[in-house]
Swiss-Prot record:
It is found in: Cytoplasm. Bidirectionally degrades single-stranded DNA into large acid-insoluble oligonucleotides, which are then degraded further into small acid-soluble oligonucleotides. PANTHER family: EXODEOXYRIBONUCLEASE 7 SMALL SUBUNIT (PTHR34137:SF1). Heterooligomer composed of large and small subunits. Pfam families: Exonuc_VII_S. GO terms for biological process: DNA catabolic process. This is Exodeoxyribonuclease 7 small subunit. Its EC number is 3.1.11.6. The lineage of its organism: Bacteria, Pseudomonadati, Pseudomonadota, Gammaproteobacteria, Vibrionales. GO terms for molecular function: exodeoxyribonuclease VII activity. It is an enzyme of class 3 (hydrolase). The keyword Cytoplasm applies. Belongs to the XseB family. InterPro entries: Exonuc_VII_S (IPR003761), Exonuc_VII_ssu_sf (IPR037004). The gene is xseB.
Length: 80
């Protein structure tokens, strides 16, 4: 099975894989090279998850803005 890029995964799948990696790393039975690969993957997953959360927070802020007369516009995460 091919490993998905973190940015192409759902937030829930990202958290699930990250949780699994943490369990494996905490177990301590991995060779150093395997542990380092899993750590690098975990960092990529954590960063992707943080990006997804930031995007969601921005969308919620837009929806809850106090200006009821403001026109709605599409959210574009690349604009930041």
């Amino acid at each position: 099975m091919a490993v998905k890029k973190p940015e192409n995964m759902t937030f829930e799948a990202t958290i699930e894989e990250l949780d699994s990696l943490v369990d494996q790393l905490e177990n301590g039975d991995l060779a150093l090279d395997d542990a380092l690969r899993k750590f690098e993957r975990g960092i990529a997953l954590a960063r992707a998850g943080q990006t997804k959360l930031s995007d969601a927070e921005q969308r919620v802020s837009i929806l809850l803005s106090e200006d009821d007369e403001a026109p709605l516009s599409d959210f574009n995460p690349e604009s930041e």
